[in-house]
Each structure stands twice: as structure tokens, then as C-alpha cells.
């Protein structure tokens, strides 16, 4: 088999919204530049995601030199400019973590509140914000638990072969997609090099109901697919369902689509039960 290569790089500036495909990217300690650097919360500061507000996956963002441009169904275009952010910081909650986050503006709050029909606020991972990966001295953005997620195309193909209706890779929201490897080969990788960056695979990624939300329609699958099928062959002893690998970057540097994936070291893969 040919060398494994990086085939897609995606950053998700706003947690739970559409990703942006990149040809090349700067990788920092927190992951891809800008990835999950914005979060939407309720009025108490608790984070909101596509798990409960699936329409978020239909929010499209484009990166500009001064901020972001947002579009969503039925909404006017919104321009987000860093220079217009407030200087106010407030504690927000992402899972069990409290993070001091920079409030952006009332205008952006109102835009998302109107779109979701739910009162909410919009925050940025500002220069005074700090969060770390649980158990590691490693900076983290508003991502669920780790800075980066990697999945191979072969693994998705193996899943889709078991599904009546195949799903797109976007439904799993990876940052890095690789090809030209065996299905679930990434389960056994420990350290890899892509471009200028060495990555450590920390753990497999536990999957939730968000994977059942169609990235085009914004609707949740009534049969809870692909999660129901994944459960049949990717459930571990802890009863969690895993698909993809969580990574941390061991140094800053650039990566680009087409880069070779060098497998530096391996470790024993997680074991999974198989059911009919």
C-alpha cells in the first residue's frame, strides 16, 4: 500500500457549526488555528452544541483578515470583527470546565438568539482565557476534550459498508482526514508526523448523539444512525462508542493537504466487542 497521506484539513471556528476546509494550516498547542475558538452559551454561560440545537450545523462561516462572515438559513449575513469585541470576560462552562471567555457583542448575541429562537450569548477564547486538557499540561480551546480529531477514509468506508444509508465524513467533524491506510489503522498509532508537526494520539474519540445529525439538513436521524451501527462493533468495555482518534500536537508548525503521514510509533489498539 502507498504511503498514508493527509487528504483533508478542517477547522471549526465556532463550536458545533460548519467546518472550513483548508489546503494548509498552522497547528498550535490548542489545535488548528481558530478551531473552536468561539462558543455559544445560554444566559448562564453553559455551552450550547448541536446535541441540543442541531440547527447550528447549518451556520456557515468564512475567515477574513479581521474576523468571520456568518450565514445561516433565513438570516442576514453577519460580519464578526475582532476589533469590535467587548473587553468583558465572563466564566463559561464547557462540560465540567469553567473558562474565562471574552464576550463578543450584543449584536452577535441577538443574531444567534434569533436564529436559534433561544436566548444566548457568544464568546471568544481571548488572550486572558485559559483551559487545559484533563490530566495533561496542554492548552485547549472550547473543543470537547482534546485539540484535534483524526479519522481515516478507510474507517469511514468500513462503517458505510454496514449502513443502509452512508454518511459523510463531515458528520463526525474531524480536523484531519487521512487516506491510503487500512481501515482503523489509526487505532494502533501512537506518534505520527505530518508536515512540520509531530502528533501524539492520546485516546480514541468517544461518540455521542451529535453524530446522528445530518450536516446538510440539520436533522437528527430517527434510527440514531450511524451511532446504532457503530455500537455493534466499536463499543468498548466502558460502554462508550469510539470512532476516530484524539490528538495533541507536540510542537507548532504547518501542515498541508498531500503531506505524508509518517508513523513514528505504535501502541496496542483499544479492544471492542462485536454484536449482531
Spans of model-derived segments:
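Metal-cofactor-dependent catalytic cores
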Residues: 1-276
Amino acid at each position: 500500500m502507498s504511503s498514508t497521506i493527509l487528504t483533508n484539513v478542517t477547522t471549526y471556528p465556532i463550536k458545533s457549526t460548519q467546518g472550513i476546509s483548508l489546503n494548509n494550516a498552522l497547528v498550535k498547542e490548542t489545535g488548528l488555528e481558530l478551531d473552536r475558538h468561539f462558543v455559544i452559551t445560554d444566559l448562564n454561560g453553559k455551552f450550547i452544541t448541536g446535541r441540543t440545537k442541531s440547527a447550528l450545523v447549518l451556520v456557515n462561516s468564512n475567515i477574513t483578515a479581521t474576523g468571520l462572515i456568518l450565514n445561516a438559513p433565513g438570516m442576514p449575513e453577519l460580519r464578526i470583527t475582532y476589533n469590535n469585541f467587548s473587553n468583558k470576560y465572563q466564566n463559561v462552562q464547557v462540560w465540567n470546565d469553567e473558562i474565562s471567555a471574552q464576550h463578543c457583542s450584543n449584536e452577535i448575541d441577538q443574531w444567534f438568539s434569533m436564529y436559534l429562537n433561544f436566548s444566548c450569548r457568544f464568546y471568544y477564547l481571548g488572550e486572558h482565557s485559559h483551559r487545559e486538557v484533563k490530566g495533561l499540561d496542554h492548552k485547549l480551546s472550547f473543543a470537547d476534550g482534546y485539540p484535534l480529531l483524526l479519522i481515516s477514509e478507510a474507517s469511514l468506508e468500513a462503517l458505510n459498508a454496514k449502513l443502509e444509508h452512508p454518511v459523510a465524513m463531515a458528520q463526525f467533524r474531524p480536523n484531519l482526514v487521512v487516506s491510503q491506510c487500512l481501515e482503523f489503522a489509526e487505532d494502533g498509532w501512537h506518534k505520527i508526523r505530518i508536515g512540520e508537526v509531530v502528533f501524539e494520539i492520546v485516546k480514541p474519540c468517544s461518540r455521542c448523539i451529535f453524530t446522528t445529525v445530518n450536516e446538510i439538513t440539520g436533522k437528527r436521524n430517527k434510527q440514531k444512525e450511524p451511532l446504532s451501527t457503530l455500537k455493534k462493533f466499536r463499543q468498548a468495555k466502558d460502554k462508550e462508542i469510539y470512532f476516530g482518534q484524539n490528538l495533541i500536537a507536540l510542537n507548532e508548525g504547518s501542515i498541508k493537504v498531500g503531506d505524508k503521514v509518517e508513523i513514528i510509533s505504535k501502541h496496542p489498539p483499544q479492544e471492542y466487542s462485536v454484536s449482531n
